[in-house]
Amino acid sequence: MTTPSDLNIYQLIDTQNGRVTPRIYTDPDIYQLELERIFGRCWLFLAHESQIPKPGDFFNTYMGEDAVVVVRQKDGSIKAFLNQCRHRAMRVSYADCGNTRAFTCPYHGWSYGINGELIDVPLEPRAYPQGLCKSHWGLNEVPCVESYKGLIFGNWDTSAPGLHDYLGDIAWYLDGMLDRREGGTEIVGGVQKWVINCNWKFPAEQFASDQYHALFSHASAVQVLGAKDDGSDKRLGDGQTARPVWETAKDALQFGQDGHGSGFFFTEKPDANVWVDGAVSSYYRETYAEAEQRLGEVRALRLAGHNNIFPTLSWLNGTATLRVWHPRGPDQVEVWTFCITDKAASDEVKAAFENSATRAFGPAGFLEQDDSENWCEIQKLLKGHRARNSKLCLEMGLGQEKRRDDGIPGITNYIFSETAARGMYQRWADLLSSESWQEVLDKTAAYQQEVMK
């Protein structure tokens, strides 16, 4: 059995000097350890409460590569179970979502209540004349399930920090999407799913730490939507302009702490996002006063940027995109993307949000294709022996981290930096190399203290 010491994790990651060895994106032994020590120990996004509003409502998803079903209980609480019959390991729930009174295995017909209890075994008296203790054979329950402002998370590890502590300061940034208006948020439409042939850490890192790529990877989109030859702004309708936000923002920052990451621009207009639909832009202007009252000016204006909760929950504020990177091996990830909107928005505005999210970041989105192509090409190159063992530079903004005194929390840097990426890989290495969560937390504290010297 391969152990963390066999893999020499800390020789592959050097966050103090900004180095990473790309074998971390290709090694199957590392991937198996990730399934155990990251996806088996971290809080993972399961669903939004709006997707399962009534008792018996369920939603099927994954925790790493483990299929799980999330179910609203009769008392309104939420449980999650391994989607696996206890008889011969068959899946018991197949529909993406729906409402049910029971989950019945199609192999031998064992049936489970929405509370996970085994309630029926076909031909039980004849098949088990010695008796069967059904109370012992219920579905395996995810022991830790908590919600944060509508987002449901699960964790297999009962020794892990609670969700509130796990999120830490990233919750302040997350509230900029979840808490703009009274009533919170909801998921609009279904889930778009597709597969990208790359390691899960590429998209997670980009959403945590990488605004730098947008100037170059998305150059064609910027050229099409950007300023006219005379320097004036193109008009997109409803008063919206298309000048890239990095040309007009007065400042910008990146946040990187506890493995999480975020970055955004300080803008002066409540519609400063080049990628959104005109109706969405108008909606942001019309609701700005409420958002500012609830969140303050900085977060109310924050419509452009990037975010990731370690390991695999990402979102983009202005385009209302919420996405999960489900790992499917060391060289493949399955993307699930949701459109998340204010519940108080009109149906017309919600439809405009959905159109904007799909247009830019759907499976055929004009920005999504740029990103996917980058990640796939990197993964192809890393098949080479020298390529996957040649150290990469992770030095951007190294040593420039600071804590702000204006109420914006956490370890920050200028937006064009890799503070969040270094923090993400440090948390990644600490999880893989530690036997307990307390050991992880101690290592994180020591790293962050060193960063802020």
Curated annotation (Swiss-Prot):
Signal peptide: none annotated. The keyword Metal-binding applies. Its cofactor is Fe cation; [2Fe-2S] cluster. GO terms for biological process: 3-phenylpropionate catabolic process. Keywords: 2Fe-2S, Aromatic hydrocarbons catabolism, Dioxygenase, Iron, Iron-sulfur, Metal-binding, NAD, Oxidoreductase. InterPro entries: 3PPDioc_HcaE, HcaE, RHO_NdoB-like_C, Rieske_2Fe-2S, Rieske_2Fe-2S_sf, Ring-hydroxy_dOase_2Fe2S_BS, Ring_hydroxy_dOase_asu_C_dom, Rng_hydr_dOase-A. [2Fe-2S] cluster binds at C85, H87, C105, H108. GO terms for molecular function: 2 iron, 2 sulfur cluster binding; 3-phenylpropionate dioxygenase activity; iron ion binding. Pathway: Aromatic compound metabolism; 3-phenylpropanoate degradation. The keyword Repeat does not apply. Binds 1 Fe cation. Its EC number is 1.14.12.19. It catalyses: 3-phenylpropanoate + NADH + O2 + H(+) = 3-(cis-5,6-dihydroxycyclohexa-1,3-dien-1-yl)propanoate + NAD(+); (E)-cinnamate + NADH + O2 + H(+) = (2E)-3-(cis-5,6-dihydroxycyclohexa-1,3-dien-1-yl)prop-2-enoate + NAD(+). Part of the multicomponent 3-phenylpropionate dioxygenase. Converts 3-phenylpropionic acid (PP) and cinnamic acid (CI) into 3-phenylpropionate-dihydrodiol (PP-dihydrodiol) and cinnamic acid-dihydrodiol (CI-dihydrodiol), respectively. Belongs to the bacterial ring-hydroxylating dioxygenase alpha subunit family. This dioxygenase system consists of four proteins: the two subunits of the hydroxylase component (HcaE and HcaF), a ferredoxin (HcaC) and a ferredoxin reductase (HcaD). NCBIfam families: 3PPDioc_HcaE. PANTHER family: 3-PHENYLPROPIONATE_CINNAMIC ACID DIOXYGENASE SUBUNIT ALPHA (PTHR43756:SF1), CHOLINE MONOOXYGENASE, CHLOROPLASTIC (PTHR43756). This is 3-phenylpropionate/cinnamic acid dioxygenase subunit alpha. It comes from Shigella flexneri serotype 5b (strain 8401).
